[in-house]
């Protein structure tokens, strides 16, 4: 879920940088257009389609503009470079990176030759090249270019100039997506300080960095800090831009996503619906920005176990993205994965498999077969087979995803840790404990080093290792790990979070299996209360906890208590089975 808020924040940040350059290059194009009678009309149409994100319509116009520039000004003129850059921008938004890169490089070569390698306009083109590499997962290239842009702008404008802040923000966003949060935070803080000084603490430009910094804290599960920043940004935008401005809707969406990740689904739903109403009004019902929010609403309903409602939102988001961005765009792939997960949880495995495979094909085509994106899709597909207990299919996919993550993201990255944990979980379920333990231990060590000993993902890894020891019958090793996980989750996520409920349930299992029924019962009861409150009384997770509680009562010889609890669990399952399509696998 977190990739959704982060992805939203990332695009909003990138669009600002793109928009600033577009404004500059379009202005230059219009000046040059006086020499060509049809150029003003072409530029006007291009601007309209670009700003409304109708890229499939903008592309042929941008191609025509470039052709005219080449004919009238020559292949090495700055005006031709501007047209090449604009066409590259369109291709980048369409996810056609192979077409975009040579155009950017051509524009860059011309600008460097005419203006020199240290000119601010060269930095603007370099910035777009860095965006391209960031989106294709070539982070080392992007980092090097952003650092060059920063050096140029600091020299040209000074270390405390808003242009410098723009680059600091972009470089911080790159580190954010690389999972290097310790590098990202001081850059965001510096950018925020510059903007507060240059524009004031309540300026919309200041709100941009508040949004990005908030997303960083969400990624670290520091929801208290994130909530305050998003609330401040929302207050600024509502006051300065109005409650119905698109940027106000972006902040509503970020705050809503924070509430979603905190398990506060009602708050999240209300804010997302507000943001949707604004965006539909300002951008239209079929705009990519509308698709972002529609997709996010789907994630809320999915988290609540309202899979049918989620499906309708994911289907709508998919339809918009396929139409506006194309069937092979990365954003289309993201929605395919979200819809696949929804079908997976509805036990419609054949539908889920088809969508996951399509999402994987998009990632392999756009980013490459050994990209972080492809590894993520392989992980999803492996998890689908795991849930179907098709371990023979699941294992090689996890292993392939792990090899890619280690190569692309690094052996100590959180992406690698996630795959290690999943592969360890697979071996645990297969009873291959000797294979599982070193993987789970390695995942825990990575999270501890990368995110800290009290991060929720560290808690999850500790809990996974505890579960493994419990399955091995090594209860003395398991208990302190489960207790550690619970302590972290209660502190960082809250006592009523769903992750807290899961750990309570696992700890209850440990005490049940060791015959410590007096300790197990209140843990099961507490987990049940949380799940009923957040998910509703008829959710499958509620039925699972009821089963655990019934088993406890049977073991204690309390059949009068066990019977109604067991019957309630069976009733929930029967109702769910009746209301879902027949399982397809």
What feature does the model see in each segment?
Residues 1-585:
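Intrinsic-disorder-linked linear interaction elements in eukaryotic regulatory proteins
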